[in-house]
Structure formats: structure tokens, C-alpha cells
Amino acid sequence: MLPNEAMYPYTAKEARDRGELELWRANFRTNCACAGAIELAIHRDFDGMHLKDGCAKSVIDQYGYRRVGYVLANTLQLHAYDGRYHETNKRWSRTIFVPEDGGHRHTFLIGSHPAVLDGFVSDYRAELEQLQANSNQAMCMGEMTM
């Protein structure tokens, strides 16, 4: 498994050409594990009607914002036809580049019900917005002390 925010940026073919197939494999396995962790978190925090607030946080803590976003975006991009995902979440997913990779993308699709997964995506995005707001506030505070 790769560390939290370390992501291998190339496809399997590019990795093979670069002699970095083991790095690609580690990244791929981590993407698959992240998708599984998302499914487990949803299973744990969905009561049949509502997804518990903060459900995404445990997965973010384990895999990092970047990888969780990448895995979520992959699923939404591959299921763009599904009307159960909110349009704002689908639009957000298109801002993340997930390269075609010879069918490997389909291996780390998240299998949770789309309406519930949509709630998880919204929760993830709220966590990300909070992180960005805190970062901006910290930068402003740093500028004020200079």
C-alpha cells in the first residue's frame, strides 16, 4: 500500500514502459482498498434511511483527501448516466482526471447504492471544503502576523 497522499500518476502501460510496474500495482491495490473502505464505512454508518454525518472522515483519515476523491470521482465518471447522483457531484467528479487504464478503473468502482454513495460524496466534499476554509484562514492569519 502507498502512503496516504502518495499517488502514482501513470497508467499500467506507461508504468510498464517506465519500468515502474510495482509502483503502479501498489497504487492500484491502494485504490481498490480505498473503494472497499468506502463501502464498509457506508455499511457501518447507513441506518437504512440516513447516512451518519462525518461518514467520510474515517476513510479520509486512512487514505487521504486526494485518494478518496480520486476513487469517488472514478465511480461517478463511470456511472455518469445514473440519475441518482446529484448533478453537482457529477460535475465535481469531472474536475478530477482519472485516465483510461485498460479496464482497470472498473476494478475499484464503489458498489454501494448510488443514492447512498451520493450522500457520501456530498459528505466528502463538505470535509474538503472545511479543510480548504481552514487552510485559507490559516494563510490569512499568517499574513496578518507578518
Label the predicted regions.
Residues M1-T145:
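Gram-negative host-targeted secretion-system effectors, predominantly Type III and Type IV
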